[in-house]
Amino acid sequence: MKAIMVVGTTSHAGKSFLTTGLCRLLRRRGDRVTPFKGQNMALNAFVTIDGGEMGHAQAVQAWAAGTVPRVAMNPILLKPQGDMTSQVIMLGQAVGTTRAQEYYQNYFDRGWQAIANSLETLAQDFDVVVCEGAGSPAEINLKHRDLTNMRVATHLQAATILIADIDRGGVFAHVVGTLQLLEPEERKLIKGIVINKFRGQRSLLDSGITWLEEYTGIPVLGVIPYGQNLFSAEDSLDILERSGRPSKEDIRIVVLRLPRIANFTDFEPLEAESGVYVDYLPLEKQLGNPDAVIIPGSKTTIADLQALQNSGMAQQIMDYAQAGGTVMGICGGYQMLGQTIADPENIEGNVSNCQGLGLLPLTTVINQEKITRQCQTITHAPPSGLTVTGYEIHQGLSRRSEHSQDFLPMFDQEELGMVNAQQNLWGCYLHGLFDNGAWRRCWLNNLRQRRGLDPLPTSIGNYQEQREGMLDSLADFVETHVNLEPILQSLPEENETP
């Protein structure tokens, strides 16, 4: 299996962006291509067809490669849950919770074996693997326990691209410093440099590129202009960089920026809708009068519920709902909208019981069993009879109160969610719900009707069709600005995984 690796001088340099583009470009060439990230730290997760959990970014890269996501593409997923701890997902299954200083001792050897085995498995089905690193490959204090960067590149003898973010400044120092801190055998693997997020006239950079190529002996493959809307962010920090203002005609949907927000990829289909403004609102801000409020998923539901309460946002939401405003909770947000959340085994932390917002007739008990599965079900609202798909990722069971005549199941599978008769209070466990185009438009039309706006057409495809177009545009963008021939020519005819 031939191997390409993308590493970055810093976090947010554009590794995911470039890896995704490469996957689509290689697919166009007719290669059987797979993405790979040995270890990912993220709260955006996806569930595979066999119920395994993996990073959502690697699922997108799999779709770019024209293949089905599988856990071997991301054998280790670390999901931060606060207090310097992370849940460890290995080969799709939760295997424990660990602190950073304990991770190397308890999981390093096991993790590397999972990575090596996954690469061997992928080699049976694919011609080319495009690997993505994490952070920087030159973190001296972390290098001995780095499972993601040059250890993988060396294992595969991968043709490696170093990508750097010029927008933050210091790009030449970042590139040269990174190269100098690599071991000689690692540096030999770097076959090209890409400069990302350039603003301004390209010719102004020419003298710097000439110097960089002469100094390092490594070609600069391209300069990618700043294109922040071409690819979704993998990390919740990037929500801070999303900008824009709603017009008077826009439907404004507030998504609460929880401290431990998870799976905010749920809202990409809403962001892609013209006439919809998604506002990721910090808890300390005033809610105002949006068209809808969504409480998203959370890795630590009780802690984020307490943050809602302590900030005063919980009271604002309850007042807003009392006045007829539309409120939706997804996964952890669904649990928060209920009466109580109990954690008798202290799985999330030291709080054993917490009062919810009381907007839904629901009680939740967090337990050890983690539910991860894909779902297909039939909707009851709005309207009834639509087939929708999505996936569940939650650690807890929710029960509907007996005295809840005003609430109806959202789906045929009643445990997945509920809605009140007025259709302004919603809650469900289904991630990816807004990916279903007809259902999304019907839900938005409810909001538009309240504003006196005309309804949108509902006979549309699902978001995956739109995403395919976005992936093609991303690949076109990369192909226009990056010369990949030196990388492709550097690949051996046969590169067997050791």
UniProtKB/Swiss-Prot annotation:
Residues annotated as domain GATase cobBQ-type = 250-439
The UniProt entry annotates the active site at 331 (nucleophile), 431
InterPro entries the UniProt entry points to: Class_I_gatase-like, CobQ/CobB/MinD/ParA_Nub-bd_dom, CobQ_GATase1, CobQ_N, CobQ_synth, GATase_3, P-loop_NTPase
What pathway is this protein a component of? Cofactor biosynthesis; adenosylcobalamin biosynthesis
Q: Which UniProt keywords apply?
A: Cobalamin biosynthesis, Glutamine amidotransferase
Q: Which GO terms describe its molecular function?
A: ABC-type vitamin B12 transporter activity; catalytic activity
Any GO BP? cobalamin biosynthetic process
Q: Which domain of life is it from?
A: Bacteria
Coiled-coil-forming residues are: none
List the PROSITE patterns: GATASE_COBBQ (PS51274)
Question: What family is this protein classified in?
Answer: Belongs to the CobB/CobQ family. CobQ subfamily.
What this chain does, per the entry, is described as: Catalyzes amidations at positions B, D, E, and G on adenosylcobyrinic A,C-diamide. NH(2) groups are provided by glutamine, and one molecule of ATP is hydrogenolyzed for each amidation.
Q: What is this protein called?
A: Cobyric acid synthase
